[in-house]
Each structure stands twice: as structure tokens, then as C-alpha cells.
């Protein structure tokens, strides 16, 4: 339980509502720092006196609120018939190198290391 609580704290989901969510549910998104500045997908946020804030003088910091991790989390787990699946991220110039994912165990969900898509073998 301590590990689950630590993970919840990392996601800022320690309330009762967070514990009632299914274990596979993930909640990511744009967070705001204590100074009111939006935090990027890498966790980048600067103090008021940080010299790197010079980039944002006279304009606001723009943060894309569609983080890739959120978009991947919305994708359902793909049920496949075969024991080994090949993922190339869509192929062509928009894809990634082809990787083969073993789906041997009944409860195992294989995840592509490049794009994060998840696959599960459909057992009859």
C-alpha cells in the first residue's frame, strides 16, 4: 500500500476519489506550479528569479496541453490472436523501428518501448 500511495502522490491523486479509480487508470495533464506558471510535459518550471525566464519576457509561456502520454493512455489495449506481435508505430516516415513483442502469458500486456501502444493476446 505504501508504494501505491507514493505513486498516487507523484500523480497528485492522493484523495479518496483517486483511490477509487481502477488500477489501470492514469491521469496526466497540465499542472500548474505554485507561482501560477504551467508545467510542461518534462516538468519544466522556473523560479521567479531564474535567468532562463528571459525567454518569456513580454509574452506568455506556451504549453501544448495535449501531452503524448495522455493521448497514448486514451488508446485501448489491442487484442491480437498471435503470440508475437510486431509494432512499427504506423510504418513509413511517421513510424519507428519494428520491434517484436512476446505475449506469452495469459495476463501479460505487452507495451511497445517506442510508442507506448499496448497489446494483449486473446485466449480462447
From Swiss-Prot:
The keyword Transferase does not apply. It comes from the Eukaryota. The modification N6-acetyllysine is found at residue 98. One of its GO terms (biological process) is mitochondrial electron transport, NADH to ubiquinone. Mammalian complex I is composed of 45 different subunits. This is a component of the iron-sulfur (IP) fragment of the enzyme. Belongs to the complex I NDUFS6 subunit family. This is NADH dehydrogenase [ubiquinone] iron-sulfur protein 6, mitochondrial. It comes from Gorilla gorilla gorilla (Western lowland gorilla).
